[in-house]
């Protein structure tokens, strides 16, 4: 089985020689580097682990740093184990030329997240009457329980289709046809759509449902395709830069908020220390003044006693 990790660049449309228009998804699959081979004797299963998108070591967490230090290789943003793939040694590179025009592949990726959605959008339920006298919410999903009560209890069955989180799940699109390969730019053009947003991770692998071989696809205007690909690459690059800038701005804002919080705590501690110092500096009775006050009090009490005896 053939597999490769790539990055979704975007979608374009192209024309075949017979005039038909087809949708095309551009996937940039940089060389996948083989990191290690899992064996039955050592690991209990057979697999090939690859790395995709080389990054700086400072962007890794401690477990990732430890792993790449252990295998003595460069750091990669994504790592994945390929099952049923053999014939590669550690350090080998898997390129886009493992596929040819006309091959059938499966594309696996995480879909766009839609957040919390209603049952009509999530499960394609029927919309209620939209007239003014409908009498209940127009997009209400209806009853979620069953049972008549009494001896037959009413309850909500497991797996009931209801409102909830929609999207951001692993989806596989089967039987996509490879349109063309551009080895110099590490590009794979696939007929049809692929899940996920721009710059998302995509796994392409040989399809498991269809063994039918399709003739190589011939495009009518390769130059127009090249221009469209270049435009989509630029859009993907700008989107990636905007995402990085937003993340950097968010990190700077958090850093500034922490700094202001530390300054506020430091100022409060200084004010508290100053108040305690002022409290300690207040004048107190000396040792010489204390006996004098005691004598005055004793004289006053003696005079009061004498007045009472008279």
Swiss-Prot record:
It comes from the Bacteria. Pfam families: Ribosomal_L3. PROSITE patterns: RIBOSOMAL_L3. InterPro entries: Ribosomal_uL3 (IPR000597), Ribosomal_uL3_bac/org-type (IPR019927), Ribosomal_uL3_CS (IPR019926), Transl_B-barrel_sf (IPR009000). GO terms for cellular component: cytosolic large ribosomal subunit. Keywords: Ribonucleoprotein, Ribosomal protein, RNA-binding, rRNA-binding. GO terms for molecular function: rRNA binding; structural constituent of ribosome. Residues 240-281, 290-310 have a biased composition (Basic and acidic residues). GO terms for biological process: translation. Residues 240-310 are annotated as: Disordered. Belongs to the universal ribosomal protein uL3 family. Part of the 50S ribosomal subunit. Forms a cluster with proteins L14 and L19. One of the primary rRNA binding proteins, it binds directly near the 3'-end of the 23S rRNA, where it nucleates assembly of the 50S subunit. This is Large ribosomal subunit protein uL3. It comes from Malacoplasma penetrans (strain HF-2) (Mycoplasma penetrans).
